[in-house]
Regions:
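N-terminal secretory signal peptides that target proteins for export/translocation
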Residues: 1-13
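Bacterial N-terminal signal peptides
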Residues: 17-30
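His/Glu-rich zincin catalytic helix
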Residues: 31-103, 123-126, 136-137, 208-310, ...
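M16 family metallopeptidases and their MPP-like homologs
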Residues: 52, 57-85, 97-143, 172-197, ...
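Short, polar/flexible loop-turn hinges at active-site or ligand-entry regions and domain interfaces
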Residues: 91-94, 143-150
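Short, glycine/charge-rich beta-strand/loop segments that flank catalytic centers
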Residues: 117-124, 150-161
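Short, conserved secondary-structure transition motifs
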Residues: 159-166, 256-266, 374-383
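Acidic/histidine-enriched active-site and ligand-binding environments that engage anionic O-linkages
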Residues: 207, 423
């Protein structure tokens, strides 16, 4: 299991990197958080996108996402979506792999694709003057990927080599095993990249069918930032996505049920013992989300958190300890993670459990809540709005969470509205559950 909302194979070709990086730096400086104006653009063919215009630098960044992802991989063909993302720039339309990538390079563009459990996503950055040519190539990749057999075999072997290398990594082995335990037979319990065995079963027809059933306009979310206006963007959207099917043919995915109360223990010859706790959380759209968000920050979300103070600062048990809310389409979880010396593993477990129990029973103080509100309001721009790429990513994330365009402006008010009693209530609701635990390291721990 991977704790990040986005995991997969990202195959990117970057050219003129220093040139683009220079303009990206200028764009960062030109987009203060309080000046971001989000427009909703609807193309002539009805494709929706959110746009932040910035003509101060001649760049355009776009992120797009198709709902589905690796959860749509058929049983026995795990890794299909991930493999597909590695093939989009390996030839499209009349262009073979070399020709396609040469044109991307010559245009100074960056194009990448990735797959997670919930979506297949793409990113593109380009000079505004090359926009038509670059998006013409993107249109070929999105609509008419070639999936040539030689490219399939080559990219498949790269993924296989990566899997085989990761099978020597205790962290990866433990993460995959924990995912199987935590999610059971749910698609989230499968590795996004598949297995060596499952990858061998994937054919060109499988790739073509997955592309046909998953890439459709009704599952598409788009965020664009840079030197482009609404009219130009509408034309670009239709050029790239307008010929896709109107409706996807996705297999329904049930909500996942966390296997709480389980302990997964694995022995490895390694210098430290790693520990993870998983508790339930609430979805992004839940009315109690901000109360849970604040509670998590106070518990383990930063250098001033209770876990950091008790585990690292007071006792020196670990270099780092943290908690985070992991929000996916079909499950929400709160994960606590740390690594410690083997002889201190049981003490670390004990201290973490004590801090969780204290939060569940008594909640935070008024002072802790006030500090958390101040930090989380002030850090949003730094974490989400520091570059054209991060802004485009944020635009997609807000739409996928079904949040309004004025969310960034209203977010501070939503945080301030949370009361101490609400945080205490959600802490008791979530943290009194018996967690799922992963512990791996030397046998003596």
């Amino acid at each position: 299991m991977n704790t990040s909302i986005m995991r997969g194979f990202a195959h990117a070709r970057t050219a003129c990197a220093a040139f683009i990086a220079f303009f990206l730096l200028l764009m960062v400086c030109s987009l203060p958080a309080n000046a971001i104006e989000i427009q909703e653009v609807v193309s002539p063919k009805g494709i929706h996108a959110w746009l932040v215009e910035d003509s101060s630098v001649p760049l355009v960044s776009m992120r797009f996402s198709f709902k589905g992802g690796t959860s749509q991989d058929p049983a026995g063909k795990e890794g299909l979506a991930n493999l597909m993302t590695g093939l989009f720039d390996e030839g499209a339309g009349d262009l073979d792999s070399d020709s396609f990538q040469e044109q991307i390079d010559n245009l100074g563009a960056e194009m990448s694709f990735s797959a997670s459990g919930d979506s297949v996503s793409g990113n593109i950055r380009m000079l505004a003057e090359n926009r038509d040519a670059v998006t013409g190539l993107l249109a070929l990749a999105v609509n008419n990927p070639r999936f040539d057999q030689d490219a399939i075999d080559r990219i498949r072997q790269q993924v296989v080599a990566s899997i085989e290398a990761s099978q020597r990594n205790p962290s990866t082995i433990a993460s995959r095993k924990f995912g199987e335990v935590l999610y059971g037979n749910h698609p989230y319990g499968r590795p996004d990249e598949g297995t060596v065995k499952s990858l061998q079963t994937i054919s060109r027809d499988d790739l073509l069918n997955f592309h046909r059933t998953n890439f459709a306009r009704d599952r598409l979310t788009i965020g664009v930032v840079g030197s482009i206006d609404a009219k130009e963007l509408g034309e670009m959207l239709d050029r790239v996505f307008g010929d896709l099917p109107a409706m996807a043919e996705l297999v329904p995915v049930p909500d996942a049920k966390l296997a709480l109360g389980t302990t997964t223990s694995l022995s490895f010859d390694m210098p430290q013992t790693s520990i993870s706790f998983v508790y339930p959380a609430v979805p992004r759209k839940d009315p109690e989300f901000f109360a849970a968000y604040l509670m998590n920050h106070i518990l383990g979300g930063g250098f001033t958190s209770r876990l950091y103070a008790e585990v690292r600062e007071k006792r020196g048990l670990a270099y780092s300890v943290s908690s985070a809310m992991v929000l996916r389409d079909h499950v929400s979880a709160l994960m606590i993670s740390t690594a410690t010396r083997p002889e201190k593993a049981q003490e670390s477990l004990k201290i973490i459990r004590e801090q969780v129990a204290a939060m569940a029973n008594d909640g935070p103080t008024e002072a802790e809540l006030a500090a958390a509100k101040s930090y989380l309001k002030g850090s949003y721009a730094v974490n989400n709005l520091t570059s054209s790429v991060s802004i485009a990513d944020t635009l997609v994330g807000l739409q996928e969470a079904e949040l309004p365009r004025d969310y960034i402006d209203k977010r501070g008010e939503l945080i301030d509205a949370v009361t101490l009693d609400q945080v205490k209530t959600i802490a008791k609701k979530l943290l009194q559950a018996e967690p799922a635990i992963l512990i791996y390291g030397p046998a003596q721990s």
